[in-house]
From Swiss-Prot:
This is Transcription elongation factor GreA. Belongs to the GreA/GreB family. InterPro entries: GreA/GreB_C_sf, TF_GreA/GreB_CS, Tscrpt_elong_fac_GreA, Tscrpt_elong_fac_GreA/B, Tscrpt_elong_fac_GreA/B_C, Tscrpt_elong_fac_GreA/B_fam, Tscrpt_elong_fac_GreA/B_N, Tscrpt_elong_fac_GreA/B_N_sf. PROSITE patterns: GREAB_1, GREAB_2. The gene is greA. It comes from the Bacteria. GO terms for biological process: DNA-templated transcription elongation; regulation of DNA-templated transcription elongation. SUPFAM superfamilies: FKBP-like, GreA transcript cleavage protein, N-terminal domain. NCBIfam families: greA, PRK00226.1-2, PRK00226.1-4. GO terms for molecular function: DNA binding; RNA polymerase binding. Necessary for efficient RNA polymerase transcription elongation past template-encoded arresting sites. The arresting sites in DNA have the property of trapping a certain fraction of elongating RNA polymerases that pass through, resulting in locked ternary complexes. Cleavage of the nascent transcript by cleavage factors such as GreA or GreB allows the resumption of elongation from the new 3'terminus. GreA releases sequences of 2 to 3 nucleotides. It comes from Prosthecochloris aestuarii (strain DSM 271 / SK 413). Residues 43-75 form a coiled coil. Keywords: Coiled coil, DNA-binding, Transcription, Transcription regulation.
Length: 160
């Protein structure tokens, strides 16, 4: 897969730091567990050894995945993001048209790698993200989600 991944500087640094931790600290710890399990003798019935090997495989897979993503990453400068329409790294204020209390919701659209719904960061590939991309202030959007349909009006587009 050679698709570009658009990240904030913080997102890129977080991934780079995680990769560094896996390669320097975690890899060493896992190799020590494997060596310790080997010392217990017969490997054919050694659950500790099998668990350590499984942990090693998962860790190596994560390392390859992070290296791949960092190779494909482009760091976006928030100062260069336009706010005439909803794009990756823009934040939007939405009015929930399905509620009678004029509920206002705020999201920031990010790559899948940086999505964190607890912080209001949603993926541009999510149903909400896909529905918002390219829209302008004042537009109404209908979003198909597993629970049904949501209806919002875009009130504001800005960069944090």
């Amino acid at each position: 897969m050679s698709d570009r991944i658009y990240l904030t500087k913080q997102g890129y640094n977080r991934m780079r730091d995680e990769l560094n931790l896996l390669k320097t600290v975690v890899r060493k710890e896992v190799l020590e567990k494997i060596a310790e399990a080997r010392a217990h003798g017969d490997l054919s019935e050694n659950a500790e050894y099998e668990a350590a090997r499984e942990q090693q495989a998962q860790m190596e897979s994560k390392i390859v995945d992070l290296e791949n993503k960092l190779t494909r990453a482009s760091i976006l400068d928030p100062k260069q993001i336009r706010t005439d329409r909803v794009y990756i790294l823009t934040s939007v204020k939405l009015r929930n048209l399905d509620e009678t209390d004029d509920e206002i919701i705020e999201y920031t659209l990010v790559s899948s790698e940086e999505a964190d719904t607890d912080q209001g960061k949603i993926s541009v590939r999510s149903p909400v993200g896909k529905a918002l991309i390219g829209k302008a202030v004042g537009e109404k959007v209908q979003i198909h989600v597993p629970k049904g349909e949501l209806h919002y009006e875009i009130l504001e587009i800005f960069v944090k």
